[in-house]
Amino acid sequence: MELLGQKVKEDGVVIDEKILKVDGFLNHQIDAKLMNEVGRTFYEQFKDKGITKILTIEASGIAPAIMAALHFDVPCLFAKKAKPSTLTDGYYETSIHSFTKNKTSTVIVSKEFLSEEDTVLIIDDFLANGDASLGLYDIAQQANAKTAGIGIVVEKSFQNGHQRLEEAGLTVSSLCKVASLEGNKVTLVGEE
């Protein structure tokens, strides 16, 4: 997705050779028009897969996931990082390690909203080592739901997340693939 690639190159801030900050349009302030295009693109790629639900994790995955859900005309379900007192009827849970935050969290999804009748498209903002996507896939498996694929907004292709997801048998669609953050510069796949 060319527009997204331009935005990553122009507005992304390289923190170090493994961390890219995109707070200006994705992780803090959200460019709604760009996220609409992201959602539309995921719809075009997965529209024939019988998607019944978009699954993501709070918080940064919600914006692209909700836009995808609008295009699919299905609900968006996000895994919570804390169990609310209102969740009393059972839930699926898994542990997910955040590469950026270097923190492991237990995330949960209510059994009320995910079942074997669902075909989910997992959406996430970033793909580094693949832990978040694999954790969401684990939750879908616990529910006996089918996973149609994984939609990633920005993939750090120099890390092993894509490979890990494919080794798990998952279809991965990354809209922007970053080849390198070396030299304090964003280099996209195909520009090396």
Swiss-Prot record:
Catalytic activity: XMP + diphosphate = xanthine + 5-phospho-alpha-D-ribose 1-diphosphate
Subunit and partners: Homodimer.
Pathway, per record: Purine metabolism; XMP biosynthesis via salvage pathway; XMP from xanthine: step 1/1
Parts forming coiled coils: none
Function, in words: Converts the preformed base xanthine, a product of nucleic acid breakdown, to xanthosine 5'-monophosphate (XMP), so it can be reused for RNA or DNA synthesis.
Root EC class: transferase
Ligand binding (5-phospho-alpha-D-ribose 1-diphosphate): A128, N129, G130, D131, A132
Single annotated GO MF: xanthine phosphoribosyltransferase activity
Protein family membership: Belongs to the purine/pyrimidine phosphoribosyltransferase family. Xpt subfamily.
GO CC annotation: cytoplasm
UniProt EC number: 2.4.2.22
Primary gene name: xpt
Gene Ontology biological process terms, A to Z: purine ribonucleoside salvage; xanthine metabolic process; XMP salvage
Cysteine-cysteine disulfides: none
Keywords noted in UniProt: Cytoplasm, Glycosyltransferase, Purine salvage, Transferase
Ligand binding (xanthine): L20, N27, K156
Gene3D superfamilies the UniProt entry points to: 3.40.50.2020
SUPFAM superfamilies recorded: PRTase-like
Primary localisation category: cytoplasm
Compartment list: Cytoplasm
Keyword match Transferase: yes
Protein name as it appears in the record: Xanthine phosphoribosyltransferase
Organism domain of life: Bacteria
